[in-house]
Amino acid sequence: MLSCSDQPDPHAQLIGGGGYSKYLVAQGQWLGKLNNNRNKKIPFNFEVKKDSIFIINSEERIGARISIYKDSLRVKIPVFDSELRFIKTKDGLRGYWHNNTKTNQKLLFHAFLNPKGQKNRFNVGKNNTYSLYSGNWETTFSKGTKNEYKSLAIFHQEGEFATGTFITETGDYRYLQGNVCNDSIFLSCFDGAHAFLFEGSLIDNVIHGVFYSGLQWSEPWVSFKNDSFALTNPYLLTQKVSRERLEFTFPNIDGGNLSYPDKRFHNKVVIIQIFGSWCPNCVDETKFLAGLYDRYQDRGLEIIGLAFESPKKLSDKIARVKDLKSHTGSKYEFLIAGNASKKEAQNALPWLNEVSSFPTTIFVDKKGHIRKIHTGFYGPGTGEHYAKYTAEVDALIEGLLNE
């Protein structure tokens, strides 16, 4: 039970951090670790090519540049206001991950070369008699407390290697990667916005685990296999308040204001996206909506992104959203609607009964009537759930455009 550990540092191989190279960091595969204050290490894989780093989470690759910053090196994570700052040592790399969206949030970071490019993030040992975890698991986080919530865990296992995610009613935990060791499963993710670690042990067909996030957050979770389990329909969670009119005016990112309704949107199908650039699920959705807009804009589709951002100054909020727009190649309209708060989003949009998730997506027909509201987003890390949802949206837009 929980007998595995993170991959031990093979100090004899730690030659990549301090040796001579024409590049800032030695080339090849690396294994990084972030230390939280619960005495846990959150491992992640990355590859260095020239002066670029590619953070690896299962099928995902997040590229960023390595640069010189004062007396150290820095990797600024795209879109998210976070960065790795580190120095080279004879043993590898050592420094901190700074999450600037959270006050005083920094985690110790160290990394060592992984010359064989092995996928294992955790030490599975030589005599691993692994349990079988593949399948769908009905999951409850913080069971028996006021913070209890349901989730669908999806695990894929090939021998000792495991990937998967947890889907909730507000989104998903994106690409998780790790290992199975005897009766235990270990999964982790680092994407620049979050650092996640899931540990679980299979006891009498039930997984008992703990979820760690960032510097100090943790909560228990319990799962049992249930291929028929489904979460609440995400189209039923958020509703329009019937007495309130769908309307708003917010500043755009080009120095003006934009309103809905407006003659620009007359006889157009409109998607209204409630999001924040700090939210990985929102970034996943923005990439999807960018492609949707490219396909349907000339047929009468408009998309308006309502951003709720962390910085206090409007200029800083605009800068964050412009960064997201550039990173995703999005060509649709973005407005600054307020601060990064569900309560503030609710107050800014009184025609909704609540805003329980970033993102929340509203589909409006040519007559200005709300036809559907989708709470959360099932990103590409959810596999068939993402494929199903994106196909549903395509069909919905086709139907609305043809009306």
Regions found by a protein language model. Name each.
Residues 2-3:
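C-terminal motif of bacterial Sec signal peptides marking the signal peptidase cleavage site
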Residues 13-20, 24-89, 122-123, 128-202:
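Central antiparallel beta-sheet cores of small beta-barrel/beta-sandwich binding domains
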Residues 103-141, 233-239, 245-248:
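Surface-exposed beta-loop interaction hotspot
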Residues 212-251, 256, 263-267:
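N-proximal helix/coil linker or "cap" segments that precede and/or mark the start of modular domains
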Residues 258-283, 289:
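Short active-site neighborhood of thiol/selenol oxidoreductases, capturing the structured segment around
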Residues 284-329, 340-348:
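Structural microenvironment flanking redox-active thiols in thiol-disulfide oxidoreductases
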Residues 329-333, 352-362:
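Structural micro-motif
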Residues 357-403:
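Thiol-/selenol-based redox modules, centered on thioredoxin-like
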